Each structure stands twice: as structure tokens, then as C-alpha cells.
Amino acid sequence: MLKKGVRILAIASGPIQTSRKSTILVGVVFRDGTIEGVLSESIAVNGADATEKIVRMVLRSRFREQIKIVASNGIAIAGLNVLDLGLMERRLRVHTVVLTRKKPHEGELLMALRRFGEAGGKNVESRIEEVKTANLRGFSRIGGFYLQSGLDKNDLKAIYGQAFESLRIAHLIAKGVSYGESKGRI
């Protein structure tokens, strides 16, 4: 059972611009409806560095001992930069929550990864395995959202509103920093 007032780190990547090989990664530390901090890093578009960058970003922050949940809007950020949820949980000793409006279709993401690998001559097998492993967790539908996590359903019900709001704010910051003004939905 999670304690009341748990700190969530919401992760959002900036927009993908064809002229750039990287984008901003924003982390918002959120607790009880309050933004307590903002973290940032640069990640490769369609790269394989998102998990390591998130781990490094958290470990060097003053919030490292307080963050108990890392939330993302999907398992792939900055295009096809796939998160290794298990590695993040082990290295940071946190829970991970993937929250989406629509139920993800594993087949579509796997097909996109394979096409990307074939087109660029890149080995994407480790990313494909990360997607398959994450999807073993299944999805819970709560409050109109799909959540994927190792947390039990009662804990998910307690935090999904905070997780969504923190992701919304992280998304606004990432877009605002990149474009000079925020726009769009998560």
C-alpha cells in the first residue's frame, strides 16, 4: 500500500523535429497537486537512451530518495525510444506507471520497431523484448485511462489522477520549452 502524498516523477519528451536528432526530456516531480521540481535531460529521437537518461536524471537530483513512482504516457518516448520499466524499477527502487488514453496495441509498436530497424540497419531486438516484457503486466482501466503497472488496482485508483495531471504538466513544459508555447494533448 502506498503512503498518502507519494511523489510522482512524470516523464514527457519534447516534439520530434526532423532537423534534430535529439529532443528534451522533462521530468516533473509532483506531490498532492503541487509541482515540487522540474528535471530535464536531452535524449535521442528514436534512440535507445531514454531509460539510462531517466535513471541518471533521478540519481543526480535532490529528489532521488523521495520519488516513489515514475509515470510516462506510453512505453516509447521521443519516437521509438523504448523504456525498460524493470530496469528503472530496480535501479531507482520505484514503481513505474504507464498511463494512456487509448489502449496500446503491442503489434503496432512492434511493427514500427521492426521497420525502423530494417530501414536503418539497427538492431532493435532488445527494444522489442522490453515492449513484450512490459505488456506481460496487462492493463487496468481506471477513470477512462489505461494504466500498466506492477502496483495493485487499489494503489492505481489512488494515484491515477495525480499521475495524469503530472504527465499533463510535464507535456506542457516539454512543448513550451521546445516551441516557446505549449500546445496539444497528451
Regions of interest found by a model, annotated:
Residues 1-18:
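Two-metal-ion RNase H-like nuclease active-site motif
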Residues 3, 22, 45, 49-53, ...:
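Conserved active-site and cofactor/substrate-binding residues in soluble primary-metabolism enzymes
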Residues 11-12, 68-74, 97-100:
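Short glycine-rich or small-residue beta-strand-to-loop segments that form or flank ligand, phosphate
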Residues 14-18, 74-83, 102-105:
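Gly/Ser/Thr-rich loops at beta-strand to alpha-helix junctions
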Residues 21-78:
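A glycine-rich, hydrophobic loop/mini-helix early in the fold
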Residues 42-43, 55-60, 108-111, 115-118, ...:
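Charge-biased, low-complexity intrinsically disordered regions
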Residues 85-144:
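Long, charge-dense
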Residues 148-186:
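Charge-patterned, long linear interaction tracts outside catalytic cores
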